[in-house]
Amino acid sequence: MHEAPDPLRLELAAAAARLIADSGLDYANAKKKALRQVLGDGPVPRGSMPDNDEIDAALREHLELFDADHARRVAERRRTAAALMKRLQAFHPYLTGAVWKGIVTEHAPIHLQLFHDNPKDVEIELLNEGVDFEVSTVPHFRSGAEVEAIGFYLGDAPVLLSLYGHDDLRGALRGGPAGAERGNRDALLERLEQAA
């Protein structure tokens, strides 16, 4: 028998989704702020915190209801991602995050995970193309250890490249409970074709 959804959990997911859509917060900070908005300083009942998949569902619903440009933005960012993946094909790019999932806020970057053993090669390629970028770090999708990331804009679209070793690709292709968490250019083109 399937349990009825917890109303508090749904409310927290909706509040976090609004914060992500309207303020560009990341999921962790949106959850914290949603907790304060909904519960104040009160205790958090056990099991009431929504997971990222629940927030994704609430965010998709929010964007479909309140963002008339959402479908256009998804298609536009996916086309931009496909073109960028073609340019960076030597680095084995995979699209992940909001653009892959099709829940693209104004603030959501095109997040490509590159699987290449020398991050400097990626930087040199971007410098040769005249791309103005910033280097930072992001947590590894599996271990949580810091990996190099490169951020820049392509037109008005923010881009985030996270750089992994080639061997990391093996573990990256396992699907999660919500399906594949990333896809190569062929998989992205298939999604674009399905949406057309």
Predicted regions and their residues:
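Catalytic core of pol beta-like nucleotidyltransferases
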Residues: 2-24, 31-106, 117-196
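Mid-length scaffold segments of soluble, non-membrane domains
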Residues: 109, 113-115
